[in-house]
């Protein structure tokens, strides 16, 4: 029936987390087809779009304007515009803007499609060597309010846990994890995934603390912690 031929209007398009070769053919084609591209930071996305010869109207869509922008974007979608959302790196709406827009579009009965593609936590989990049959993704922990509550709630977690962390907080986070999970808990930290200086450090939380106290702390970090055995 014709009902099933609804053209998908909102696409969530993953972008490389460091290596441009990780862009999929389909991602490039969708970005060339849509009418509007929403980017987390237009300056970050410009080189990527230029590299793949994508010349489209690009608007900023980030955590500071997404609440306001959603209704306007929904209006464009209802007019039949095709829109793609990209984040600075990886899959939109995973620890990045996008969730509010997806929810609003679905509420309005619009079609939403997320393309498979780059995301930082999957390679970090797989190459950590920690059990990955069951895991929980925690993203960024709250910076202040609710941080200790969240950590206490995870103290009994049996699944492998995955966190995102920024370089300036990584040592403090390792110390907090030692307090909650103990010195001997197995863990793995991946940084600069898919880039030239990719590094995966595995061992106990104590091993990781020693390593990062004595080595430069740069790049994007994914922190995997083994569950309670």
Predicted regions: what they are:
Residues 160, 164-229:
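A contiguous loop/helix-start segment that scaffolds small-molecule binding in enzyme catalytic cores
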Residues 62, 70-119:
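Glycine/small-residue-rich loop that forms an oxyanion/phosphate-binding "nest" at active or ligand-binding sites
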Residues 17-20, 88-92, 167-169, 228-229:
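Short glycine-rich anion-binding loops that position phosphate/pyrophosphate groups of nucleotides
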Residues 9-10, 80-84, 160:
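Loop/turn-to-beta-strand initiation segments
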Residues 61-67, 141-142:
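Conserved helicase motor
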Residues 31-37, 110-112, 160-161:
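Short active-site oxyanion
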């Amino acid at each position: 029936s014709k009902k099933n031929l609804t053209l998908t209007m909102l696409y969530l398009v993953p972008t490389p987390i460091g290596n441009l070769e990780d862009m999929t053919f389909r991602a490039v084609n969708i970005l060339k087809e849509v009418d509007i591209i929403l980017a987390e930071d237009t300056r970050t996305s410009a080189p990527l779009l230029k590299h793949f010869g994508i010349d489209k109207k690009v608007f900023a869509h980030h955590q500071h304007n997404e609440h306001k922008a959603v209704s306007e974007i929904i209006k464009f979608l209802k007019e039949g515009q095709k829109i793609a959302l990209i984040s600075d790196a990886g899959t939109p709406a995973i620890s990045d803007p996008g969730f509010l827009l997806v929810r609003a579009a679905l509420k309005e009965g619009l079609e939403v499609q997320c393309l498979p593609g780059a995301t930082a936590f999957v390679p970090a989990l797989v190459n950590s060597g920690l059990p990955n049959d069951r895991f929980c993704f925690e993203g960024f922990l709250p910076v202040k309010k609710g941080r200790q509550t969240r950590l206490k709630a995870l103290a009994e977690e049996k699944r492998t846990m995955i966190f995102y962390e920024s370089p300036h907080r990584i040592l403090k986070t390792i110390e907090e994890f030692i307090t909650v999970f103990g010195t001997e808990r197995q863990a793995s930290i991946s940084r600069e995934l898919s880039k030239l200086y990719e590094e995966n450090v595995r061992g106990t939380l104590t091993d990781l603390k020693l390593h990062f106290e004595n080595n430069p702390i740069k790049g994007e970090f994914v922190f995997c912690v083994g569950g309670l055995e």
